[in-house]
From Swiss-Prot:
One of its GO terms (biological process) is symbiont-mediated suppression of host cytoplasmic pattern recognition receptor signaling pathway via inhibition of IRF3 activity. The lineage of its organism: Viruses, Monodnaviria, Shotokuvirae, Cossaviricota, Papovaviricetes. Plays a major role in the induction and maintenance of cellular transformation. Acts mainly as an oncoprotein by stimulating the destruction of many host cell key regulatory proteins. E6 associates with host UBE3A/E6-AP ubiquitin-protein ligase, and inactivates tumor suppressors TP53 and TP73 by targeting them to the 26S proteasome for degradation. In turn, DNA damage and chromosomal instabilities increase and lead to cell proliferation and cancer development. This is Protein E6. It is found in: Host cytoplasm; Host nucleus. A motif (PDZ-binding domain) lies at residues 156-158.
Length: 158
């Protein structure tokens, strides 16, 4: 992996890093900043899709694997949670439509799409302010947590 000593020349998004290194997302190799394990191909795509920033340690670029992202997102939630509001309340507070706000998933940190934001609005689910940013749940995390609750409920029934 190439070294980037000058912070002004560092690409901070994974697609930009690929362009700078003259490679593709499919061929890039990058390690996790937390566990130092090389990201698998699917994790590289998920990191790029999540629109997270590449970080640099001693000029070497790093990303984050999915297990570390979920782990540190939970720690972030437990440490920095401040409040929960309904989507309509958030629109009133910010004087901005939900569609124009950047809201990430509280579990996997992916940006919520308009349909996922609308789902929070119509089902009256709360958005949570964590570390100064509002978060919700993406479609994948919403359904997987629902399935986990359903499975636990079935296991406890005799």
């Amino acid at each position: 992996m190439a070294l980037f000593h000058n912070p002004e020349e560092r690409p901070y998004k994974l697609p930009d890093l690929c362009r700078t290194l003259d490679t593709t997302l499919h061929d890039v190799t990058i390690d996790c900043v937390y566990c130092r394990r090389q990201l698998q191909r699917t994790e590289v795509y998920e990191f790029a899709f999540s629109d997270l920033c590449v970080v640099y340690r001693d000029g070497v670029p790093f990303a984050a694997c999915q297990s570390c992202i979920k782990f540190y997102a939970k720690i972030r939630e437990l440490r920095y949670y401040s409040e929960s509001v309904y989507a309509t309340t958030l629109e009133t507070i910010t004087n901005t439509k939900l569609y124009n706000l950047l809201i990430r998933c509280m579990s996997c940190l992916k940006p919520l799409c308009p349909a996922e934001k609308l789902r929070h609005l119509t089902t009256k689910r709360r958005l949570h302010k964590i570390a100064g940013n509002f978060t919700g749940q993406c479609r994948h995390c919403w359904t997987s947590k629902r399935e986990d609750r359903r499975r636990i409920r079935q296991e406890t029934q005799v």
